[in-house]
Amino acid sequence: MEHPPGSDAETAEASPTRLELIDRAARRLGAADRSAPRRTAEWLLAELLDCDRAHLYAHPDRTVAAAAAEQFHRMVGRRVQGEPLQHILGYASFYGLRLRVSPDVMVPRPETETVVDRALTCIEEVSRPRVLDAGTGSGCIALALKHERPDAEVHACDVSTDALAVARANAQDLGLDVRFFEGDLCAEVPAATPRDVDLLVSNPPYIPDAEAESLPPVVREYDPDRSLFAGRDPLRFYRALVRWVSACCVPGGSFVLEVHAEHAAEVERLFRGEEGVGAVHTEEDLSGRPRIVWGRTERATAS
């Protein structure tokens, strides 16, 4: 007799095979309208069994102990309820790095890798660059830059001590030396902030409060509000970042900022109108949406 997906009778069955678990979980996730249900089931089971997805299908008839199967059903249940896969796994992949995530930080997005790409281009000719990641969250951008440029001196700040704890744990896990400190983008630039950076990079909160209800529940309910929302003024943090760029970047230094697609032109105009800022550009992500505003400060002129 076929039991309803997720029923007590199903979860109580002893020693199911790997393939049976995947099939049942995929049906359960599909019924809940979760994206990529089969792939999600594979990821969860592979994580639980500490193997890769290919290994699951190399031994599809291998049985799974009842206790492990029950744990798997609980993991699937969390995803059915809408919890992000990365929270269930406890980590996210970003720029080839495995990073811890928790409800204290925003899950790193694949599109933010475009920010890292542009940032690396901006400092490719700079020997031993000094970098500042303002609003680091999980540390994903700072750590990716340090991983790709071991010679860089990377500093990173966040207003949240809980987020900084996650970022520091990620740095320790990866063996990467990034200097973290507490700092509020909208307050005075902290004394601990380096004032001679070759690159300032930031992915600040940029979603207007009015758009909150239009966000997918997996974002609205699980990412911290402070990482998402800019309040009534979607340019609030970019106005602050103008001050940070002015205070922290060396002449000829670069800044790379992730932006809301609908406000990219406004952010570009904001920086174009700032004294001491040179060329400013908007760059699209792989989906063709404006994703980055970047530019350079003016080089010092010989007197």
Swiss-Prot record:
This protein's record includes keyword Iron: no
Single Gene Ontology MF annotation: nucleic acid binding
Matches recorded under InterPro entries: DNA_methylase_N6_adenine_CS (IPR002052), HemK-like (IPR004556), N5-glutamine_MTase (IPR050320), PrmC_N (IPR040758), RF_methyltr_PrmC (IPR019874), SAM-dependent_MTases_sf (IPR029063), Small_mtfrase_dom (IPR007848)
Residue positions binding substrate: 203-206
Superkingdom of source: Bacteria
Gene3D superfamilies: DNA helicase RuvA subunit, C-terminal domain, Vaccinia Virus protein VP39
Enzyme Commission number(s): 2.1.1.297
Name of protein: Release factor glutamine methyltransferase
Species of provenance: Salinibacter ruber (strain DSM 13855 / M31)
